[in-house]
Curated annotation (Swiss-Prot):
UniProt keyword annotations, A-Z: Ribonucleoprotein, Ribosomal protein
Family: Belongs to the bacterial ribosomal protein bL32 family.
Compositional bias segments (type: Basic residues): 49-59
An annotated Gene Ontology molecular function: structural constituent of ribosome
Gene: rpmF
Single GO biological process annotation from the record: translation
The protein's name in its UniProt record: Large ribosomal subunit protein bL32
Length: 59
């Protein structure tokens, strides 16, 4: 099992943890309907990049 040789200072510990924060997922707006969805995913009403690609129950 790995064991550290020297104690890491609070400054170095903070630098190590500086990239561990969570980021918000980027959202996209569907140009034809104005609906918000995850990027590179089909919107809930079946549109992707302005075109109808999936049939929904209402169609």
């Amino acid at each position: 099992m790995a064991v550290q040789q020297n104690k890491k200072s609070p400054s170095k510990r903070g630098m190590h943890r500086s990239h561990d924060f969570l980021t918000a997922t980027p959202l996209a707006v569907e140009p034809s309907t104005g609906e918000v969805h995850l990027r590179h995913h089909v919107s809930p009403n079946g549109y992707y990049r302005g075109k109808k690609v999936v049939k929904t129950k209402n169609d």
